[in-house]
Amino acid sequence: GYGNGGNHPSSSILPGLLASGNALNDLVLPMIVGYEISNRLSAATHPRLTRTGFTPTAIWGPVGSAVALCKLAEEPYSCIRQAVAISLFCPPIGLFSYLQEMVSAVPQHHGWAARFGSDAVHLSRAGLNGSDNPLGGQKSLPDLLGVELNFGSPSIELDGETIKTVYTKREIGCRHCHPSAALARALKKSRQVEIEAIESVDISTYKVALGFSKVPDERQELYACLMSIPWIFSANLIFGEVTPHLLTDRFRHPEILRLAKKVQIYESSDAEAHYPLSLNSEVSVKVLGLRESLKLAEVMSYSSESDLFAPESLFDPAFGADELTSKFKKNCAGVISEKDTHSLVNLYS
């Protein structure tokens, strides 16, 4: 995801490019162009768009998708302009509350964003047009969404490369769960805590993350678990990591849900003051028999440029090419053959 914009450019831009059937090397420049367009629009409206209640990927993903496909096909400026305008007519207006309610259909909005960008290009090629000023004026899309796009503002960077602050998720789960997951692993490494002796867990964090404080019900639907700070924290504290295998077998581990029900999430004024530049969280664990609670704080930033796949935090090391390859192989184990895994690693290296 793009830390400075709250969006996930890969999920809306890569599907259309990969579906084109072109050689991977031919997709690199169009991908970068698509990333830059959607990222800069996202950055210009972040975190206001999220706080207003909408998902940045659904809003700005179609624009990036359309521009990337136009770049791939070397379309003329007139086609690009109309494709962008059409993509801003009725993009999938993803409601952020659906993420917080753990609605399992939510991941589909990435695909809708990708498809709408592709459709916009087809319509533009056919001669259809969009608005002359799709991003400005009263009742434009930004106006209706309650955000502003001032292209003279310092918040909109027209130089530099936003792609350098698009980072790989180092672990399974919503990005807003990651600070708490890191805290859980740090606790597991530093203190041998008897899980059943834990009486309560208090996590203090920024306001947006409060929306991910629900505990999954007894069904433990997959998306609900991935979007739950209590569940992700508990799974990491018990097992040290959330793996595809653990997700598959989650019903065999009722202790995760039992611990998750003891987790409470609170707003921290300090963490809120640092959001969105960094995703900060503090945890306090009350353990039976211990006079004082166990306390740790995590500072996790995705806003600074790095050539790594994920920057370091207080408890997690930086995520380089070797770490990414190792993680990929580990996640593929038991899902696809070792031979196919190595082929994919060689293909994308």
Stretch-by-stretch model annotation:
Residues 1-164, 174, 209, 349:
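N-terminal core-entry segment
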Residues 1-6, 102-115, 122-349:
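Terminal-appendage/accessory-domain detector
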